Amino acid sequence: MLLRLLLPLLLLWSTSLSAQGFDSLMRTHGMVEVTQLAPHIRVELKYATRDNFIGENMYGALKKAYLHPNLARALARAQQALEAELPGYRFLIYDAARPQSVQRRMYQAVAGTPKKIYVAAPERGGRHNYGVAVDLTIIDDKGKPLDMGSPFDHFGEEAHLGNEEARVRAGIFSEAVPRNRALMRRLLGAEGLRPYDKEWWHYQERMPMSEVRKRYRLLAF
């Protein structure tokens, strides 16, 4: 009976934390809001919607993308280079810094399934949990995402980097996919970021995870 009475209060507390607290906690943990440095970058956080592999809104009302200042500045420079090369084109962020509590929920959702290889264990945290990884794509001057070969959060070989030309020959990819992925790698690579080979959308700083844990603060909330 007591638990039944407490459940609505716990739900209200959780909703309040995600709706109001995440923004404040991101800032107190040293993160910066990306569009303050790069106002032309678009943000559509997939984990603030049901359009993700879990099918739940895990961010509540959080709509802004936060990153460690180093990564945010690198992304801002990459956006400038993109616009100089292709006026009107922008990066579109799907996910950025991620609270450890959200990581736990994601990990629990894939536990015991083949998808678990794609989600970092929450105890020590992955790169998103330190604000040094970003999930993104490129949109054209009409706001349409470029063809990258698979949707965001696709758990399959189509999301993996490499063999793009072979997949074009096999009719799996359009001829635009290798060009679009190469554009991402070139622009972001020029700013010191590298991709994760199993997720075309995931870019991170070029340092081992052990060094990330030494230098940066875990988003332990």
What are these regions (language model features)?
Residues 14-16:
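N-terminal signal peptide c-region/cleavage motif recognized by signal peptidases
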Residues 99:
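Segments that shape or occlude catalytic/ligand-binding pockets
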Residues 102:
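Short, well-ordered surface patches within globular domains
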Residues 203:
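Conserved metal-phosphate-binding beta-hairpin within the catalytic cores
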